[in-house]
Amino acid sequence: MRHYEIVFLVHPDQSEQVGGMVERYTKAIEEDGGKIHRLEDWGRRQLAYAINNVHKAHYVLMNVECSAKALAELEDNFRYNDAVIRNLVMRRDEAVTEQSEMLKAEESRNERRERRERPNDNAEGADGDDNSDSDNADE
């Protein structure tokens, strides 16, 4: 069995169906004896250029180990599913299990955002405590 990296883009109106699609695709691979090494749902993102007058799409990344038969079935599913607007299958030399750069960058952005918001939350909590202490002193 060979290793593959698969990225597919789903029409934004069909984003609710992504979970079911991924489940069907992973089931087809695993039933044929393959493995899913990495599965990342990148969510809705802006496209570099419009595809069929669509400017956003739901991105999904999969790193799998599967047979040629399972891969052909997966590619047929992509081809005949109107919700999948683009797909790319690349053969890899080995399994990739670590997080993708896209997900790492998103997590670091979220961490920075949380750090920026924390000092404001602490300052508000301190002000609230001071006011309640002064209220208790008046009684």
UniProtKB/Swiss-Prot annotation:
Q: Name one GO molecular function term.
A: structural constituent of ribosome
- Specify where the region named Disordered lies, as residue ranges: 95-139
Do the record's keywords include RNA-binding? yes
Keywords in alphabetical order:
Ribonucleoprotein, Ribosomal protein, RNA-binding, rRNA-binding
Q: Where is the composition biased (Acidic residues)?
A: 124-139
Which GO cellular component term is one of those annotated? cytosolic small ribosomal subunit
Which HAMAP family does the protein's record reference? Answer: Ribosomal_bS6
Give the family this protein belongs to, as stated in its UniProt record. Belongs to the bacterial ribosomal protein bS6 family.
What's the protein called, per UniProt? Answer: Small ribosomal subunit protein bS6
What organism does this protein naturally occur in?
A: Pseudomonas aeruginosa (strain ATCC 15692 / DSM 22644 / CIP 104116 / JCM 14847 / LMG 12228 / 1C / PRS 101 / PAO1)
Q: What is the lineage of its organism?
A: Bacteria, Pseudomonadati, Pseudomonadota, Gammaproteobacteria, Pseudomonadales
